[in-house]
């Protein structure tokens, strides 16, 4: 019968596939993004897309040197020859009229691209006329761009000396015009177009002269006495652009079917010349009936996209833009295609000129030079579009049939869609992105284009950056003017992506009234919650630290809109609505008072108990900024601040460190507002701390909690350098053996053997005491911790009176508590706040200076961290606590300390003579009382002035910026853990297969029967006395806790894997450990007897350092005891619930998913809880108590009825109470007297009893095998089967010449294998198993 009671199946996982399925279905604890990521924002995007020097071409000089009817002497023209200039035959009319008509036509052609520019023609000019024209245009243009168009078809070719030709007044001579002079007149920025043979020569000469100018400028700058420095400085030509029709050695084509100014035609009438050139190609024969005359009759206008001609122009723009974006470097693309509308048009058309003119062995030249584009694949798409258009012309013109629109844009969007569906890893960006931009304003393609654009932006910040660089911003900004409801979700998504990467767009939105669009979306109850969430984020960005945005959104009724959605079931929406509220009234008093009128703060209170930690954190942020306004105070506002503060104070023991960090920041706002009040409270507290003795620890006798006197063995509080600065993380994987025997000298001069407690954690900790700006704390951790513990005793209240219970007093208590928080980031922030007030209070005390001192206080610096010399100090090892309580004049001089070894502290130092000492150097680091400080002559007002700014500047959590990262990341992509082909998924599969193998093999060994368990398979000396030991369920790793550190051993290889400090204070000890997510990504939970819980990752990892995932105060008001249960826990992986109890009167249940307390079940006893065991299937909790009782609770029932059974058969301390996991599991309990009792939870009495050895110190029950192991103070371990029969004793270590084992301090069975780990007071840890032949 007993055997049946102890024997349990594989926790209901008898079949391999069932067990494997359970692994997949088990929830993972502390694996959310808030646990895996650092709480900080993304790195800000360099705004390369936003043009800082956007320009306009405001003036255009059209210089035509045609001399109609007279050919220049150095050009021999063919017969027939190209004659058309600006599509005018100059011989069809008189020379003068022809010249004027050509000039007028050229101006019209340019006006199509820039109608607002100022145009000036200079027809067959002289040098003076050109000079006058250029200087006039430059003078009027100021800093804007001027265009100089030069047609030199009627004059000789440019010279190698850098000259072009114009005329004399009588047209009897060609006069040279130096490019150097032209540069001087035109200035910069300018763009030059040269349409003449050998035009490349001009470009070369231009560059040479520009370089010469730069050298002259440099000489004048270096030597003011140089003759060049006395002359007017020449303008720099750096910002000049040139377009030339051909290379330096080339002539313009003279084919009669082409215009003579082919280059100009390409630049100014691209569609006309492109169609004409297309008709001259052989491929046009495939389209019958198309002639040069027919293409002149293409219906429509260039600027009307609905017509054939307009559609062709639109397609041409899209294609040339796309070619440029795909070929040009990004910065060059921005400069040439996005900076200036006219320049962009000319360069798009220049790509056509290159394609057409290269077919006639003529190569257009540009400066800056472009990569070749004439062979780009997109030209084929252009040819197809032209082909489709021209093929319709005969029927359209002759028969009047309707025009069929080109499928070009639809096909390009499909190509873009294909690129998106094929994956983006290691691929170049989609070349169709500029085309998507082109169709955003087209009603036909807009919806599809926005959808595809959104999917592209969802790929990540790089995609957003790419889209912004291509010029998407003005288009999506303009679309906010649309009232189409179907666009709302798409636009909201796109804008959320943009603002998540570049928040500076907030100003553009407000300027264009874009915020009104999002206000209407957020107020729309028919919008899905996901899109309202994005809208709330967008508005939160608009009002973030931007007064104009705050004012605009306040007028738009944002506060009321947000308040209506605080109770929305969508948690992300609740989170961002709260953040949005917090930002709109941050440093904006009008919004705060609007919030007061709407009772916003009271409506936010409900979110403080939200099940989602991020929502609670957002609510704390919003309430923190609500009380953080620096406007003038009234009684009403003060009352509101007090109410908010007291509501926030309830989160002091929230399970999420993220929430508690935000709580510190919120309370710091209150501290800044009511600084003088807090200074008074601080002085009051410190005075009481000095006079009031700390209550003594309690001792447990017979399982009851009773106070005892303080004794010399009571652990001292640790020094300031060890707490609140847990930052040092070493790179060494193992503890250096040379440090094992290293002696460190304490202040008393005694030598102590190395232990984790002798190492300081942070070389950045305070070495002297001064202003908070240097992180040099006036209040040590010891002082703060004592203040916290003293203030928790009600007797103190009567000493100080009613004022002690004021709001400021309560908030000070909260900050004291948070300064001792187990999570270092929280305690660091709280220490900063407390010390800021302490610093301010000492400055206000106006001390007098000390003159006659033989030695001055300068505390020894914190022990430096040597990365290669000691164990991981992730949690921070406390150094030997200081015993000094020096007076202000009995001090030691600062000693130079080696960086290689922890510092030693001499007790005395030579006198330094009377001198002035900095204020911050005259305080003992660990002084007992909050003193007003030594006197000094320097004025502290300057230091005090920066006090508020210190708190405000340093009080940042990064929560809001971190939350915004969600919108910058892919939300449409399948999470990697759900992707069947991902690395993470494969690793999980491997782990679950391993788990199945371990379960199967272990069960096979157990089924063979266990007759002995004394084969020692592992033995090693632990760095500290083992207090808790825990097997990993599936890897050969065992965790061994000593008082304040954790060591990991590989029990198969016999190697030490890791050793790090847990971070708990010196006067506390680790009393429990649990592996979380043991089946997958394992974490280690540690519990200490001060009620703190810490969770670690990356332990026993050769590539990473241990890292604290989270920490919180699992139990508050734990009574300090010299002998007690400490903290006991039990973990339910299936539900993610953590049961905790110990030296308290309750069993507290934590939901690790929500990181919040679920319930407190009263134990109904006056003694401590010594053991906990739970069963998720029946919701039962079994507690063993120090008074010998076993109590069963059903957590589904009301608190007054949940204790369903109490067994009082044990008469002494219960060592173990175990609830078997299978559905009909029994309760097995053992007391220190060795009586093992079996209970059926349905029965009022035990169903069986057996007696084992007395004087137990540790006991465990194997969850699978029929085994009980117990350890004794009498230096042996006994193993029993379920019938109470002794299997074997273990009294001696193997291979130690019969050395006797020490007193057993802890032991534990492996969850699956028949392995037993035993820790003893002689520092040794050993693992025993069945005989080798059985294994």
Swiss-Prot record:
Gene3D superfamilies named among the record's database cross-references: Leucine-rich Repeat Variant (1.25.10.10), YVTN repeat-like/Quinoprotein amine dehydrogenase (2.130.10.10)
Keyword Aminoacyl-tRNA synthetase part of the UniProt annotation: no
InterPro entries reported for this sequence: ARM-like (IPR011989), ARM-type_fold (IPR016024), HEAT (IPR000357), Raptor (IPR004083), Raptor_N (IPR029347), WD40/YVTN_repeat-like_dom_sf (IPR015943), WD40_repeat_dom_sf (IPR036322), WD40_rpt (IPR001680)
Entries under Pfam families matching the protein: HEAT, Raptor_N, WD40
Modified residues (N6-acetyllysine): 1097
Impact reported for residue 792 to A: Abolishes AMPK-mediated phosphorylation. In Raptor(AA) mutant; knockin mice display higher mTORC1 activity
Gene Ontology CC annotations of this record: cytoplasm; cytoplasmic stress granule; lysosome; TORC1 complex
Positions bearing Phosphothreonine: 706, 865
Free-text description of this protein's post-translational modifications in UniProt: Insulin-stimulated phosphorylation at Ser-863 by MTOR and MAPK8 regulates mTORC1 activity. Phosphorylated at Ser-863 by NLK in response to stress, disrupting the interaction with small GTPases Rag (RagA/RRAGA, RagB/RRAGB, RagC/RRAGC and/or RagD/RRAGD), thereby preventing lysosome recruitment and activation of the mTORC1 complex. Osmotic stress also induces phosphorylation at Ser-696, Thr-706 and Ser-863 by MAPK8. Ser-863 phosphorylation is required for phosphorylation at Ser-855 and Ser-859. O-GlcNAcylated by OGT upon glucose sufficiency, promoting interaction with small GTPases Rag (RagA/RRAGA, RagB/RRAGB, RagC/RRAGC and/or RagD/RRAGD) and subsequent recruitment of mTORC1 to lysosomal membranes, leading to activation of the mTORC1 complex. Phosphorylation at Ser-722 and Ser-792 by AMPK in response to glucose starvation inhibits O-GlcNAcylation.
Compositionally biased tracts (Polar residues): 853-866, 888-898
GO molecular function: enzyme-substrate adaptor activity; protein-macromolecule adaptor activity; small GTPase binding
Record's subcellular location: Cytoplasm; Lysosome; Cytoplasmic granule
Phosphoserine PTM positions: 44, 122, 696, 719, 721-722, 738, 791-792, 836, 855, 859, 863, 877, 982
Protein family: Belongs to the WD repeat RAPTOR family.
Functional description taken from the UniProt entry: Component of the mechanistic target of rapamycin complex 1 (mTORC1), an evolutionarily conserved central nutrient sensor that stimulates anabolic reactions and macromolecule biosynthesis to promote cellular biomass generation and growth. In response to nutrients, growth factors or amino acids, mTORC1 is recruited to the lysosome membrane and promotes protein, lipid and nucleotide synthesis by phosphorylating several substrates, such as ribosomal protein S6 kinase (RPS6KB1 and RPS6KB2) and EIF4EBP1 (4E-BP1).
Subunit structure as annotated in this protein's UniProt entry: Part of the mechanistic target of rapamycin complex 1 (mTORC1) which contains MTOR, MLST8 and RPTOR. mTORC1 associates with AKT1S1/PRAS40, which inhibits its activity. mTORC1 associates with DEPTOR, which regulates its activity. mTORC1 binds to and is inhibited by FKBP12-rapamycin. Forms a complex with MTOR under both leucine-rich and -poor conditions. Interacts with (via TOS motifs) EIF4EBP1 and RPS6KB1; interaction is independent of its association with MTOR.
Stated name of the protein: Regulatory-associated protein of mTOR
Taxonomic source organism: Mus musculus (Mouse)
